[in-house]
Swiss-Prot record:
InterPro entries per UniProt: Clx_II_MBL (IPR035680), Glyoxalase_II_hydrolase (IPR050110), HAGH_C (IPR032282), Hydroxyacylglutathione_Hdrlase (IPR017782), Metallo-B-lactamas (IPR001279), RibonucZ/Hydroxyglut_hydro (IPR036866)
Sequence similarity: Belongs to the metallo-beta-lactamase superfamily. Glyoxalase II family.
Gene designation per UniProt: gloB
Lineage: Bacteria, Pseudomonadati, Pseudomonadota, Betaproteobacteria, Burkholderiales
Cofactors required: Zn(2+)
Protein name in the entry: Hydroxyacylglutathione hydrolase
Organism (species): Cupriavidus taiwanensis (strain DSM 17343 / BCRC 17206 / CCUG 44338 / CIP 107171 / LMG 19424 / R1) (Ralstonia taiwanensis (strain LMG 19424))
Function: Thiolesterase that catalyzes the hydrolysis of S-D-lactoyl-glutathione to form glutathione and D-lactic acid.
Documented EC number(s): 3.1.2.6
Keyword set, alphabetical order: Hydrolase, Metal-binding, Zinc
Amino acids binding Zn(2+) 1: 53, 55, 118, 140
Enzyme class per UniProt: hydrolase
Amino acid sequence: MLKVEPIPAFQDNYIWAIHDGHCAAVVDPGEAAPVERFLAQSGLALGAIVITHHHGDHQGGVAGLLAAHPRAPSGGPLPVLGPAGERIGGRTQALREGDVATLEAPALTLRVLDVPGHTAGHIAYVADLGEAGPALFCGDTLFASGCGRLFEGTPAQMLASLDKLAALPGDTRVYCAHEYTRSNVRFARAVEPGNAALAAWEARVEALRATNQPTLPTTIAHERQVNPFLRSREPAVRAAVSAHGGTAADDAQNFGALRGWKDNFR
């Protein structure tokens, strides 16, 4: 049975390790040292590297990991998966929407989705983890109760990307790359103070973070209830954006105003 474990990195990153008890694929290793410690402590071999986008805190550890683990457990070159539309160091397989990547160690199939917005070529991976169910590895596109900043894409692109993710089965577990949940929930509460599900989630988040536990994974069904960026078309969210001074001629402009509000929220 496949398991997913977080490897904390930097101040608030999560590198996700997908493993079968013998070999691990690591998602978005921004630095190598935490991965090396995890592998040593867990007795796992590195089987693959999986990248969602080009930012350094997501691929900065690739060179170091390849230097230490040039070969996969099978003896061939270590697979490095990444978006076709971005520069990824050491990449062996360039992926885009509709591609399906198959790993041997661990045995894992990853379906690729294009999710531009945070960066122009950002991709996400949907995995069927067997008994553990479906999982989404979405980098900096969808966060718990939030979404990534628009560094390279447009509001319309990010809205379309989030719509695509929101359409996944509700039990899909969401593995994003940052522990931003506490600040995201504070903003979400400002947008929807009357959202009862969000109030309950805020209490849960505070309890988890008080003991330094991850708030991830969440699920797509949960995000539909508590994430303002998946709820941007809801009347209450639209009204809040308008009251904050946002203009909304269409859904994309409304989303852009919501994202701009978050960018300046303190």
